[in-house]
Amino acid sequence: LVSLQGLGDRYPHQLSGGQQQRVAIARALVCKPRLMLLDEPFSNIDTQVRMKLILEIRTLLKRQGIGAIFVSHSKEEAFAFADRLALFRAGHIEQVGEPEQLYRQPQNRFVAEFLGGVNYLAAEVVDSHCVQTALEVICGHEPHGRARGERLQLMLRPQQLALAAAADGDLLVREQQFLGHHCRVLVECAGQMLEASIGEPLEGERARVTVAPHALVLFEQMS
């Protein structure tokens, strides 16, 4: 059930961290619980082993029809394990929902910044779907519920900025970091630094940007 065949004669210190966690899960399953509490169960396990083990245990619990409350300080672990997230701050729940919902539509700046990189752009509402920013007019695919002329801040994830090298582009490429599965790019727009996450490094010192329509996330301006 937990892929530990042939290890029954070993002592605990002879097992890896991942194997010890599988033993703990197996012992808990003997009682046929309806709900399990997992409190930071993977904190001392190597990163690559940790993510593999999280997916294994998630699959196992679903196959057995067992619910789980999983406590973690790692957003990567939470995204990999959870069907629903509850994000706490100082003992209070900030937001509850599906992982993608919290990431794409955070209710406040704390949730937005805790779950990933963010850019904030000054924005003025031009109609029910669009705002004017220093980049361009950016439109959402659903009404944002704000009044025309209202001045706010638009949140954009680095992945939402699509960059293309262009000699006459409005953006200055200030820094690029190749990180394997993506490239982190810092660009300057009207004196403001923005972070983008793209597939391949850019060539040249200037770029253009486009922002695909999405559900706009607008916050009040910082006082």
Feature-to-residue mapping (PLM):
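ABC ATPase nucleotide-binding domains
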Residues: L1-N108
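C-terminal boundary and immediately downstream tail of ABC-type ATPase nucleotide-binding domains
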Residues: S3, R104-D127, M155, A212
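Gly/Ser/Thr-rich helix-start
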Residues: G18-Q19, E98, E113, G117-V118, ...
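Non-catalytic connector elements of ABC transporters
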Residues: V118-Y120, H129-S223
